[in-house]
A protein has these predicted regions:
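Long, low-complexity, polar/charged, intrinsically disordered or flexibly structured peripheral segments
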Residues: 1-30, 278-283
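Nucleic-acid-processing active sites and adjacent nucleic-acid-binding tracks
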Residues: 19-47
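Conserved GTPase G-domain substructure that encodes guanine base recognition and part of the catalytic core
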Residues: 37-57, 61-282
Length: 283
């Protein structure tokens, strides 16, 4: 009952998806396994995507992915085919999906963003903003050269902002405990849940200061509809961010198929009209 979306959606993983890389012919014998592996993932995604069988995408990226080859064009092509190529088209589609985009950006390893660094102390609170660098560097790198992150939908009705707002931080319970974010969790022989936020004797207000830094961050304020709720979903005891993803998957699952049919039927009607207009001059 807590995974209602599974009654409507099937899950298919495309691990390690990347865009194309360039190799010299003389190096083919050393890079062939990598080419085949990446080609297999790309082929499967493109095959399902072109047949309109991928209704939603959960794109997972970690906190330091800017050096990796990106798949911006692959994601953008899927958006154009399944949601819309303009803010107006996307708004029309999302009006039928409770305002939730079927593209989920999942910011994994968010526990790393929450970890205290060597330079974090009560005398330089302003520098805590560097914990959210992934939003200013990784995100634009992923989708470049496209600009839809800030021009996602036409405002009005369900949409109070034009910005893309379907981003979900996700952390790992084990590493949150291992690296001093929360205390109490164990997945060993004796299981236990998180008991408390880790407190530093020399900086007891660290986590509260970090929270305020998150809430005041310009990217967060623009791209999270409710920053306080997002923080509570991912950075409170025994909440790793997954419940927010499940909540919105549940909200979209029951209406997504009808919304897709409506969009594709409208596209077919447009094609029919254009063909009729083109041929009518000859008859």
């Amino acid at each position: 009952d807590d995974r209602k979306f599974l009654h409507k959606l099937d899950l298919l993983d495309f691990p390690g998806a990347r865009s194309r890389e360039k190799y010299k012919e003389q190096d083919i014998h050393t890079v062939l396994p990598k080419i085949l592996r990446r080609g297999k993932v790309a082929y499967l995604f493109n095959k399902y995507s072109r047949s309109l069988r991928i209704s939603s995408v959960l794109f997972c990226h970690h906190n330091d992915q800017k050096a990796e080859a990106t798949i911006g064009e692959t994601i953008n092509s899927w958006i154009e085919d399944n949601i819309g190529s303009t803010p107006e088209e996307r708004a029309n589609m999302l009006n039928d999906t409770n305002g939730i985009a079927p593209l989920f950006f999942v910011a994994t390893k968010f526990n790393i963003d929450l970890e205290r660094t060597k330079t974090d102390n009560s005398s330089n609170i302003d520098k805590l903003d560097t914990h959210w660098n992934r939003f200013d560097t990784v995100f634009p790198e992923i989708i470049k050269p496209n600009k839809w992150l800030d021009n996602w939908v036409k405002t009005g009705g369900l949409f109070r902002t034009a910005a893309f707002q379907n981003i979900y931080p996700l952390r790992d319970f084990y590493w949150s405990g291992k690296n001093g974010v929360f205390d109490g969790y164990s997945d060993g022989a004796v299981k236990s849940e998180e008991k408390s936020v880790h407190t530093y004797a020399d900086y007891p207000d660290y986590f509260e200061n970090l929270k305020q830094s998150f809430l005041k961050n310009a990217f967060v304020q623009r791209h999270f509809a409710n920053p306080e709720q997002t923080w509570n979903d991912v950075a409170t005891i025994n909440n790793d961010g997954s419940k927010a993803i499940i909540r919105n998957l549940d909200a979209i699952a029951s209406v997504l198929e009808d919304a897709r049919k409506k969009k594709y039927l409208a596209q077919l009607a447009k094609i029919k009209s254009e063909m009729y207009n083109a041929l009518s001059v000859y008859f």
